[in-house]
Each structure stands twice: as C-alpha cells, then as structure tokens.
Amino acid sequence: MTTLGALVILYYPSDAQLDALGAWRHACDALLVVDNTPQPDARAREMCAREGIALLHHGNRGGIAGAYNAGLAALFRDRIDAVALFDQDSSVPAAYFPAMRDVCAGLGRRAFLAGPRIFDENACSFLPELSTNGIGLRRLHIEPGAPLQRCAFLISSGCVVSRDAFDVLGRFDETLFIDHVDTEYSFRALSRNVPLYVVPSLVLPHRIGAKQRHAIGPFEMTSMNHSWQRRYYSARNAVQLGMQYGLRFPVAIVPNLLTVWQVVQIALVERDKRAKLAGILFGVADGLFGRLGPLERTRPRLAARAQRVQQG
C-alpha cells in the first residue's frame, strides 16, 4: 500500500494553528512538523510531545525551501512513498488524504507532483490552472469530476511530492529563500519531464496575501499588501527565474511582468510606497547580479535597519 506522509511548516504559529495539528496525526501515515521559527517555539514542542507528533526545529535556515528540504529528507528516510506539503494555516478537507492516497497508488512508483485546486478565499475564486508549451500559457478548463489533469505549475501548499520526484528533481532551491520557490520547482520539473497533476475533485482553501479591493473611478484594482521584504524576494527571484529558464522556456519571463504590475499596484493604492518600491528595486538589482539567499546576507544594512525599526 502507498504510504502518504504530511509535512507542516510552522513560523510563529498561533495557538489555534498549533491546536489544529492534533487532527492531522491520524489522517496520514506519518506526520512531521518543522518549526521554522528562528528560536524553538516552546508551545509547539509541548503540543507535539503531548500528541506524539514528530517535531524538527529548523530555525528558518534556507527559508521555506530549507524547511521543505529538511522535512522531505527526514520523511523519505523513513521510507514514506510520497509527502504532502502544508502551511500552518492550511485548512485540509477530510477527503484530501484518501483521495491523494488513491492518486499516489494509481501513479505507482513514478516521479510526479500532484496538487488540489486552490480556492483563494481572499479573492473568492480559484487560482488559474495553467499549461504551457514553454512559450505561452493556456488556462485549463477543470470540471470537478474529471480525472487527473496535467498542468504546468503547482503552489507548494497541498502539493504532494513523490519519493521518485524528489530523487529526480533534488532539493528545493534554498538560495531563493521564500517567494517563487514552488515556481522554480515547477520549471525544474518541466525541464526534466517530471509530470505535474491537478486533482479536480480536491479543493484546498487558501489565503494569498492580505488582498484588498480599491475603487479608482469606474475601475477596481486588487492589492496584495505584502511587506517590502516580500516584495524584495519576489522581484529578485522573478529575475532569477527569467535568467535561469528564460532561454529554454520564454514563459519564465512572466513572473517579471507580475513584478511590473506590483509596481503599479503599490504606486496607486498601497501604503509604505517608498519602502516597497525600494525593495523591488533592490530585488531586481540583486537578481541581475546573482546575489541570492536571505536578506540578512544580501542586504545586511537594510535588514539591520528594518530590525531596529521593528524593535522600536
């Protein structure tokens, strides 16, 4: 029988998020919680000890990519066949693990990634499921009862990584740290002919950013309201994706078009314009010159100044 594990990443979790972990223990074949908070969270340690849940403290080394790598390596060492990735705020439907276990059993010992449809609760709409020929993008028409559908990109939340896929694709890129980590992995899968599938029967609710709608005359604009640090990582890593994959897959330039749209959003409707636009500018520059890794390494003075402001 196919064994399906779950990997949950914590980062300054709330009490409610910690309490929710207890329900995961019997839903999957193996549960590993990675505490990615810089200093070990005593509440997480106590809760996991009480519930008999395996806990690994990783301390945000390598960002979200590092946490995924540490957790996946540990679970695959325990001979788990496939692992589902989750954020601490993921709301997992009861049908998720039985359905994904059937998907894994059907695909057998093959390299693959599979994920549910993602319903963005902020936008009250599904994220678009896309296919690509490397040059253009095409939106897929997904029917709820349809079989597995090949796609080009999956976000990490709810995504199942098979053991063979991890063997073929390797570790997530820790130099990216956070934003576009899953986008890069999708491009890597595309380049190595590892299939990605969306499971039409499964829907995972998810909140992306702190979206707000703004009226500008007769028009409406949506803003994400990410911090300047996230703007930095997003812009920098988008440049890296374009440089790394753009010649083979011109569609890898698209994340940079999203950066341009972020500039428009910030300039028109968001607060902290100066800091966010500066973050994007620094990110583009560092992406072009290959300065990767955490902000503390690439822009230590900027990171230190932000830390002082945060501490008051």
Specify the residue positions occupied by each region the protein language model found.
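Non-catalytic, C-terminal membrane-associated alpha-helical segments of glycosyltransferases
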Residues: 243-312
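Acidic donor-binding segment of Leloir-type glycosyltransferases
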Residues: 22-57
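Short, well-formed alpha-helical segments that are part of the catalytic scaffolds
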Residues: 7-27
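A short, conserved alpha-helix in the catalytic core of glycosyltransferases
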Residues: 159, 165, 169-170, 175-202
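Conserved donor NDP-sugar-binding/catalytic core segment of glycosyltransferases
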Residues: 95-128
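Short, flexible, basic/aromatic active-site loop/helix in glycosyltransferases
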Residues: 117, 132-152
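Glycine-rich, basic loop-to-helix element that forms the pyrophosphate-binding segment
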Residues: 58-75
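Short beta-strand-to-loop acidic/aromatic patch adjacent to the donor-nucleotide binding site
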Residues: 80-91
